[in-house]
């Protein structure tokens, strides 16, 4: 266990070091300084020189705000969360929305859904339930190198549906490195060293990629999906339920994990090592070290099952009862969070209750503020008339094949998110796609869903996602290798996303992809 802890610490340090390399003592990097000036400059130039006859002044003003905020999001001139507070200042100044209307978007139901999801995830991490779940899955799947690789991917993918992909990968990487070290230590005379090296590269990448892929399984798995839910409701007044998305998301995750596993094992890092020396023994040893399931783990497990059941049954059960007919996914998330705050812990030396308010220090408040800023900006775009004007301008695309538009959007967002924040990317592009759907005469989810899913999928560069940074920080993979392997995983993801959105999603959600929805 000491080795496990040592490597977890090492990964954390390398992960943090990777991100801190670009941070100099200067208050702004060159790119940030350019963005800091360019954002307000675009705002002023738009107000002064852009005056289409059919766009009211309020629409011009919101377009100017959007350009300013988008520039600061892309360049990270100031922290992304801080940029997301600009609508609170700028929208009332232009008399687009009242302060009350703007502020209410920062307390939207979907924000509380994500808040509750984070609290549940932190409870799992606090009492180490996620480690037990991961090790149990790996132990059950098998001992061959192929099965160990698959076991790590399934375990990481499952965890990242409910906890952050960063936390899932941070847990799994040290276990993977410990297995690799054990294999080197117990290496037999007839074992090919190259095969072990190929296996360790494939294992490290498999963990990182599975952490990213797993987030597509549930609405709380990744921020872009929460943004999709919010923007869809904001623009069209319809809801994507937790249960219905799982019917779309989980098969997508299973297929993507399966194909990525085959690619890593038999194409990218093909090797002849069938069994890993000491691999299965080490997994069992880790499970034994955890001991019997503790009271607190059982409580969190029970609450987790309860939350899942409520989310899954809300659409077809809770809505049928008058008392619970108005319950939303966010209501359930906060209900289970409050239960975690109420239930006492037995190990009071560690914590008095399953969750206490110390959890506030671990919550990603910046992400929640970003959600609110995106929703406030979307409301401003709608209320100012900018959305309708954009729709009119995009009507020239009417007649273009919808599948071609979906392909272009998916590939564009996939590669854009390699160098920009996936959350900021989704926040910027989804309102545009909502308007585009009306212009080209298709259902909005045909364009918005693949963009949100693609925004989550970055496999090529360490800066693409935190999981990529973590696996790069392990020292087992180079940027060149990550980019070459990740490029093909990007293309695999694009193909699967397009097929799911075009052929599976319409059946599950009961929508006609050729039927546009009117903007609110």
Swiss-Prot record:
Gene that encodes it: sdcS
Name by which UniProt lists this protein: Sodium-dependent dicarboxylate transporter SdcS
Gene Ontology biological process terms, A to Z: carboxylic acid transmembrane transport; sodium ion transport
Gene Ontology cellular component annotations, sorted alphabetically: plasma membrane
Disulphide bridges: none
Subcellular localization: Cell membrane
Species whose genome carries this gene: Staphylococcus aureus (strain USA300)
Similarity-based family: Belongs to the SLC13A/DASS transporter (TC 2.A.47) family. NADC subfamily.
Keywords annotated in UniProt: Cell membrane, Ion transport, Membrane, Sodium, Sodium transport, Symport, Transmembrane, Transmembrane helix, Transport
CDD domains hit by this protein: SLC13_permease
Transmembrane segments: 30-50, 55-75, 77-97, 104-124, 160-180, 207-227, 242-262, 298-318, 323-343, 362-382, 399-419, 428-448, 452-472, 491-511
Domain of life according to the entry: Bacteria
Role of this protein: Mediates the transport of the dicarboxylates fumarate, malate, and succinate across the cytoplasmic membrane via a Na(+)-electrochemical gradient.
Pfam families listed in its UniProt record: Na_sulph_symp
InterPro entries, alphabetized: SLC13A/DASS
